[in-house]
Amino acid sequence: MTGYQPHPWHLVEPSPWPLVGGSAAFTLTVGLVMWFHYNSISLMILGLVMIVATMIQWWRDVIREATFQGCHTSYVLSGLRRGMVLFIVSEVFFFLAFFWAFFHSSLAPTVELGVTWPPVGVHPLNAFAVPLLNTAVLLSSGVTVTWAHHALMEGKRTEAIQSLAITVMLGLYFTGLQAWEYYEAPFTIADSVYGSTFFVATGFHGLHVIIGSTFLMVCLGRQVFYHYTSSHHFGFEAAAWYWHFVDVVWLFLYVCIYWWGS
């Protein structure tokens, strides 16, 4: 067999990962219910481990098909790009719901909140302290990931590795600052609708930063092991798009919730 096929598409081989991933998601869901109602975390941890293992194995297969088997033709890459764009659009609407909840409560505070915003008794964080530093850190990481992209397209391998490493470190630094800010916050998620919307919106953004940092760490490892070329590096492009999306969401969070909302 020559491996010839009369079309440019990649027809994937039968894979166990969709079935395993669905089972893992079900296990995690049941585990969350067990944690909420019975304070038992064993099933939830099992579900998390199964999901992480499935993600690693599945993406390992995708990397092998793209890098070592050459299955990702220009047509396949076009589909992947459109899929990533649609995924980011879905994430935009995900965060739109949190902003809607925040403005629904803040633009017309109810009597229960003291007809004021922030609610009576809630002392918001200083927008010009740690949040401003976090803004500078995340915007700087956006610059360094763009630097890495240009270095990669120009074939400057060492420069791409260095700038990617700086981006990852800035992402981890942001996460550390966010965790410290949560620890020092004078209110909790249970303190009125302000605490709920604040921690849910910024918490999910923090989760996206962790996911994006992990994505970029994988890209850094792949760059070290010569997986990318100047013309074939969609994995990194997707990570860069995702990271810029995280940057933009943070700017809206900072302006709306930290600055205007306080």
Curated annotation (Swiss-Prot):
Resulting phenotype, A160V: In strain: Bf-H07
Chief site of localization: mitochondrion
Gene Ontology biological process terms in this record: mitochondrial electron transport, cytochrome c to oxygen
GO cellular component assignments: mitochondrial inner membrane; mitochondrion
Entry's Gene Ontology molecular function annotations: cytochrome-c oxidase activity
Cellular compartment(s): Mitochondrion inner membrane
Gene3D superfamilies (alphabetical): 1.10.287.70, Cytochrome c oxidase, subunit III, four-helix bundle (1.20.120.80)
Keyword DNA-binding appears in the UniProt entry: no
Broad EC category: translocase
Segments traversing the membrane: 11-31, 32-52, 83-103, 125-147, 160-180, 198-218, 240-260
Membrane topology: Multi-pass membrane protein
Family stated for the protein in its record: Belongs to the cytochrome c oxidase subunit 3 family.
PANTHER family: CYTOCHROME C OXIDASE SUBUNIT 3, CYTOCHROME C OXIDASE SUBUNIT III
Function: Component of the cytochrome c oxidase, the last enzyme in the mitochondrial electron transport chain which drives oxidative phosphorylation. The respiratory chain contains 3 multisubunit complexes succinate dehydrogenase (complex II, CII), ubiquinol-cytochrome c oxidoreductase (cytochrome b-c1 complex, complex III, CIII) and cytochrome c oxidase (complex IV, CIV), that cooperate to transfer electrons derived from NADH and succinate to molecular oxygen, creating an electrochemical gradient over the inner membrane that drives transmembrane transport and the ATP synthase.
Protein name, per record: Cytochrome c oxidase subunit 3
Species this protein is from: Branchiostoma floridae (Florida lancelet)
Gene symbol of the encoding locus: COIII
